[in-house]
UniProtKB/Swiss-Prot annotation, chains A, B:
The keyword Transit peptide does not apply. Gene3D superfamilies: P-loop containing nucleotide triphosphate hydrolases. This is UPF0200 protein MMP1282. One of its GO terms (molecular function) is ATP binding. The keyword ATP-binding applies. Coiled coil: none annotated. It holds the Pfam family AAA_17. ATP binds at G8, M9, P10, G11, S12, G13, K14, S15. It comes from the Archaea. InterPro entries: NTP_hydrolase-rel (IPR022970), P-loop_NTPase (IPR027417).
Amino acid sequence: MKLIGITGMPGSGKSAITKLAEKYKIVVVSMGDVVRYETLKQGMPLNPENVGNTAVKLREIYGKEAIAVPCLNYVNEKYNNEDFVIIEGIRSIYEVNYIKKHAELDIIAIHSSPKTRFERLSGRNREDDSNDWNTFVERDERELNFSIGRVISLADYMVVNEGNYMDFVNDLENTFKKIINVN
Amino acid sequence: MKLIGITGMPGSGKSAITKLAEKYKIVVVSMGDVVRYETLKQGMPLNPENVGNTAVKLREIYGKEAIAVPCLNYVNEKYNNEDFVIIEGIRSIYEVNYIKKHAELDIIAIHSSPKTRFERLSGRNREDDSNDWNTFVERDERELNFSIGRVISLADYMVVNEGNYMDFVNDLENTFKKIINVN
């Protein structure tokens, strides 16, 4: 089995992978799925509090490599027969390194400029709404503090999502096809 | 004046900017130029020891924002009449933030996968020469510790250098022309 990790800053367009996954019938696992699965495994009902507590507990148990450890378990338990599994929401280089040590993993990073991402996320074309801009920068900062900058810089594939959306989806699909060996 | 900063992991192909700079007659300033200039300003002859000591001293004086502070001074003193100046070798987000606060700066990041960069730098096609691979990873690590991952992830433009070299140079030139408003 080969894992395909999708990463990118907020608003870069990572969700485009969902449509491609459907088209090529490839399972998508999000880090959130893993936490919910772990919550259920502990016999707790799924509600925001339990899921939140499980996330904290996983980080206590596995340190910087959480949620990679339960993620790999989850994939192996549930999707052992799949040739490819997409993992959404990878943002820590520790998680990447852990998974790469135990499985085959290719990382696709999606890049858009901060200006473009801000416009997408805020639905506006003006950077002078400083409150929104600060919120945007803080959100970026949180992701970067998880070491997503390292994941992006060391990505196996980089797809730029800056101009025409269909061009981007096309580039992403071509990258995707390279990984899953479809011509 | 607008500054154009070039960043990218080792072996990504940053030096391609030199030819473009010549073609469009745009000055290129490297962080090394700045340190040499500061060395001379202090009346010291240019030798590796003096240049090294100056770099250390600049970091002591300006902290994380070195070498951005003397770099901006250098550009303003020497190239005040230029419309555009390229700055090579930006690798710290603190330097980027400092320069953006005081001048107009667009960052172009160049991305190649670790595998491709390793092959370029080692001139080999095998990752199993573990000694070389470790050296490569350590060099990456040093750059990432300077926060180059943040500079890359927050770049205004991303150019991928993965396949055909002329395609890459072409993409880089198109990006470059967008910034300097040439059609």
